């Protein structure tokens, strides 16, 4: 055995000799000098001591890591292969005895806590049941032996009679002993069995379980499941005290239908509706199919349809409006400042040709009516006039029946309505409609009886006719001023303005000029050189050039402003009508105009309104199609006149759309496949070509590209400047599409007096013509007692053996009916003809 000295060992491990000797003494070795020898066994003893002093682990490693790698080949298209390497890694950790003991103690404490809680609950339950049983049964005492076998609660009653307070815990303890399974006496041995440490605990507990089984259990108060079992613990089991917890992460199936609160906006898709109801979209689609409405998962439903589906499926519906963005916009537009009086906005309304524009002409000292096509107003005109009594803003509305929507907008944007009634015509349909619009808008009326210089003017008749519709003059005790005027000579115009301004004073009209501008669109059009142009009536605040404005679903910066005379201006205050340039599209007449601080907010609101309008429109259109799908089934297909309509202003386009869509019947209809504001372009001509439509231009013309396509393809393109003409032409076209009806005209009636036989013609009826004229080779009917028994053709007509082409009334003749020989005396032969008659709408 090779030995080294202490000094050599110190040099080898690079440590001082004195320190090495000290460590050897601590290890229990006898070395004291540097020249003493050290054997291998002494080295091992020293090494073991040093490891234990540094708390190193002398046992086997506690953590084992296993790595596994598999390689496979995956073939793809093109005869290529890809190598796939899968690596798996598993780590096994051996716990120390201290950790195992700590976990065992923790589990034991948890189990004891659960047992104590369950024991306490069982005692309370047994006590409660014993008290209930005591109240139900009579208080008479019975023999103790019988009580123990027959009823488990009787001993409690007997003891309670002797000492009611002291004996109370006894029945609870008995009930607990009867109800609970027996717990093992040695939890440590049971714990070893649970960890699989050996079979000693199993063998020790076996006699104990046998003794438990041998004992006859006392009758239970009521069968029940203990809290220990429901929490996953079992008493007296096969050595394993703890089971897996049941329903720890399981899904509890609902015992009844789940009613959810479904929030539905103006539109919602089938998928979103299914998510809110926590059902599959297929169930909603299936349900809608049962209702007769085919749908898809991305189908947009309108609010009414979605509400019907959700309520039918048993859910609670809350209708919401997606107006958070609009509400924030309205909040940002609030402005407080000093208010001043503003000029009244006056709308002139009345029947067509009653002199509305002529009256305004006299007030403005202008000649607008002469420039109107056909002498009728077809746009809303906005003007402000400086009078001796103050400024007044006038809105001139059309009186034709097609412009109902325009008149309704004029009434909404106004403060006072001047109702013009012609003294010679009286109250007409559009007069009544104007009264209804004014009442709906809550606007006061001033009646101007025009054309009083004409003969036949009857003011009392007009007062009487208007009083029927709720407009009573001040002379008759009402509150509506009646002023007699003549727009031609100017009679009564000053009195009319005075009445208007008096009404304005009563209304106390106020505005805040320092606020951001706010108003309403009166009219809009597309100018080829300047782009979209909107006529705006400023209602509050001040609109300035360069402001960022939001108009309906359009927005833009005001590049220029023009007054009603076309002169550029920098700003416009309350009650001033202006034309603004710079919007990204032509807004609808009646849209509200607001000045915003930044472009981002304007764009956000405009895009939101566009998307909302599109969704609502699609949902309603789809709902309408589905509602009519079964009604139209089996009916003959309607003939359709397709029209591409272009107009100079948005209001006229809307009026024409309404008028044209109202034409037609069950067989023919008008469909406006395209339309817009501005001239007829090449795209409009291509649309008309693709949809087989007629091009109509109302106060607009076609550009060179559109004219070229029209000439090459032979399209029908027409220009109009009066709304009467376009409606009449469309009516004629629809009438031509209706075709013609076949009508029967009775030419004559002959009565059979006698019947003769002819070898050539068979039975010949000798007749007297009693009505009209009988013609040869015309269709006839044979009537017997006024009932048609045969329809055929008149083959032979003779008079005194001579052939005749016709026989008039009061004359006798012989008639041979083709292919019919059953003619009898007293029959009537009716001769008629078929005539084609053109149909009309």
Curated annotation (Swiss-Prot):
UniProt domain tr-type G: residue ranges: 341-510
Localisation: Cytoplasm
Segments of this protein annotated with the region G1: 350-357
CDD domains: IF2_eIF5B (cd01887), IF2_mtIF2_II (cd03702), mtIF2_IVc (cd03692)
GO molecular function: GTP binding; GTPase activity; translation initiation factor activity
Highest taxon of source: Bacteria
Any one GO cellular component localisation term in the record: cytosol
Residue stretches of biased makeup (Basic residues): 235-248
Keyword Signal on entry: no
InterPro entries, alphabetized: DNA-bd_dom_put_sf (IPR009061), EF-G-like_DII (IPR053905), IF2_assoc_dom_bac (IPR013575), IF2_II (IPR044145), IF2_N (IPR006847), P-loop_NTPase (IPR027417), Small_GTP-bd (IPR005225), T_Tr_GTP-bd_dom (IPR000795)
UniProt feature, compositional bias: Basic and acidic residues: 96-136, 174-194, 200-217, 225-234
Chain segments carrying region G3: 396-399
Family note: Belongs to the TRAFAC class translation factor GTPase superfamily. Classic translation factor GTPase family. IF-2 subfamily.
Described purpose of this protein according to its UniProt entry: One of the essential components for the initiation of protein synthesis. Protects formylmethionyl-tRNA from spontaneous hydrolysis and promotes its binding to the 30S ribosomal subunits. Also involved in the hydrolysis of GTP during the formation of the 70S ribosomal complex.
Name of this protein: Translation initiation factor IF-2
Organism (species): Pseudomonas fluorescens (strain SBW25)
Gene for this chain: infB
